[in-house]
Amino acid sequence: MSAPDQDWEKVRDPAANNALIKAYLPGHVGVEFTSIEDGRVTGRLQIQQHHLAPNGFMHAATVVTLADTCAGFGCRHNLPAGASGFTTIDLTCSYLGTSTEGAIACVAEMVHGGRTTQVWDVKVRREGDDKVIALFRCTQMVLYPRA
């Protein structure tokens, strides 16, 4: 398997990014980008049985996959000049609710965009009633080519 084309971070079209993730974990889970802008990414996921835990409620990893994917693509699309990539150095997710059907959506926003780190906050909501079900935050270390 080959890595994605390194120029993909320049393309902010949600459809192009959805095609890119199709063969990777976010695509298999069903993550869909709805918008990609400076410092902001939105996405959604239609809940299916494989997103649920054995207790019938949405599995925590489903929420993290949606939130982390949107934050990660936000970081990638907002890297400083000269950066070659990023890696996650911290993430946390506070669950405030759950869902068993319908869809969930999120808004990822950059709260810090420095030369060496970025911090992204993500609110995950149920689409049906707009209830916030999770607050996610991740810190990304910005990577540069070795001299």
Predicted region positions:
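Terminal targeting signals and extreme-terminal segments of soluble enzymes
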Residues: M1-A147
